[in-house]
Amino acid sequence: MSIPSRCIVRRARRRTRRAPLLFVHGAFAGAWCWDEYFLPYFAARGYDAWAVDLRGHGADGMADDFVSVDDYVADVLCAATDIGERPVLLGHSMGAIVVQRALSRLQ
């Protein structure tokens, strides 16, 4: 399993059969917003917890061109594929819209 360059990952302390979690931030945030509490919390409870930086956010920096929700959906689907097994997607604010669109493409 490779780690996408725009993801923060906290591995489960003990291996379980639980699906990995992929957190998607809202506008004006990045993967970092999940890392102080949420990722360690779920990793301690047996989940591999991932958070993706959508393009133009977080460690990725400012986007040079216009970025659409469809671009963000592509980022989430790419991260979900790189995880290696289907994750549970969790989004906050704008991230929830991205998650809804991503889920509609996965079905």
Task: Identify the role of each PLM range.
Residues 48, 56-88:
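Active-site loop/oxyanion-hole signature of alpha/beta-hydrolase fold enzymes
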Residues 37, 75, 98:
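Short Gly/charged-rich anion-binding patches and loops
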Residues 86-107:
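Conserved hydrolase catalytic core segment
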Residues 2-12:
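A short loop-to-beta-strand scaffold at the N-terminal edge of the catalytic core in hydrolase folds
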Residues 14-59:
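Conserved HGGG/HGGXW glycine-rich cap/lid loop of the alpha/beta-hydrolase fold
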Residues 39-40, 80, 99, 103:
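Short amphipathic alpha-helical segments and helix-helix/interface helices
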Residues 38-41, 66-67, 106-107:
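Glycine-rich, phosphate-binding/catalytic loops in enzymes
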